[in-house]
UniProtKB/Swiss-Prot annotation:
Domain of life per record: Bacteria
Annotated EC: 2.1.1.223
The protein's name: tRNA1(Val) (adenine(37)-N6)-methyltransferase
Subcellular location, record wording: Cytoplasm
Family label: Belongs to the methyltransferase superfamily. tRNA (adenine-N(6)-)-methyltransferase family.
Species of provenance: Histophilus somni (strain 2336) (Haemophilus somnus)
GO terms of biological process kind: methylation; tRNA processing
Its job: Specifically methylates the adenine in position 37 of tRNA(1)(Val) (anticodon cmo5UAC).
GO cellular component terms attached to this protein's record: cytoplasm
Length: 236
């Protein structure tokens, strides 16, 4: 089934007909879950439609500055338009650049960095090169994404990611940062976790572990999912 070409939230609207990767639950979870307390500068890597950057803008105080990076030209232009049409056009800056190059060139450091990186390994070709690049782990590994984010991170900052469960567990073992929060995402009550929300820091401290169920056994959105996302979804 084709996804909608637009998506309306409580405080902003997303057009996505030019973007390979559409608005999805993963991005909404990350945008709502990421800890942005006391953050002044925020960065969303691989912003796509601009969804997470806009969610961070909605959640953060007016003085905060948000940057977003997107390589694909069509996605960049659409995210730029989505941002300009939002209430936070003066709060978000967007850059068309590869995240590795951006990490090398950018002189600024950020308090909070978010990323919803591509997660399917190369296999069956997608219908378009644009979607192929957006969806598959072709050009950079998840460790590359985390290393790029680390270069851009303030000393006391935090990086927040969402990944498939096994890839997330593997990344925790490979990276040189400390995992300080881990939330197992269970699509339906009684099932095994499919995703991991992860927070990384340079500072070592006890990892806060939790889990979140999206659908209960009656195929209804769980109370915890509604609570997390109620500031965004129109029907919550």
């Amino acid at each position: 089934m084709a996804k909608k070409q637009e998506f309306t939230f409580k405080q902003f609207h997303i057009n996505q007909d030019q973007c390979a990767m559409k608005v999805g639950t993963d991005g909404i979870l990350l945008g709502a879950w990421a800890n942005i307390n006391q953050a002044n500068t925020l960065l969303d890597l691989g912003t796509g439609t601009g969804l997470i950057a806009l969610m961070l803008a909605q959640r953060s105080p007016e003085h905060c500055q948000i940057s977003a990076v997107e390589l694909d030209q069509l996605a960049y232009l659409q995210a730029k338009d989505n941002i300009q049409q939002s209430p936070w056009a003066n709060k978000i800056k967007i850059f068309q650049q590869d995240i590795i190059v951006f990490a090398q060139d950018c002189e600024h450091k950020f308090d909070v960095i978010t990323a919803n990186p591509p997660y399917f390994k190369q296999g069956v070709d997608c219908a378009s090169k644009q979607r192929n690049l957006a969806r598959y782990t072709l050009t950079q590994s998840h460790l590359d994404w985390l290393n790029a984010a680390e270069k851009l991170l303030n000393l006391t900052g935090e990086i927040h990611l969402i990944l498939p469960f096994e890839e997330g567990k593997s990344l925790q073992k490979k990276c040189g940062l400390f995992c300080i929060r881990e939330c197992k995402i269970i699509t339906k009550a009684g099932k095994t976790p499919q995703r991991l929300l992860l927070s990384f820091s340079r500072e070592e401290r006890k990892c806060e572990e939790s889990q979140l169920v999206i659908y209960d056994r009656n195929n209804q959105y769980s109370t915890e999912f509604k609570t997390l996302t109620q500031d965004f979804y129109l029907n919550f």
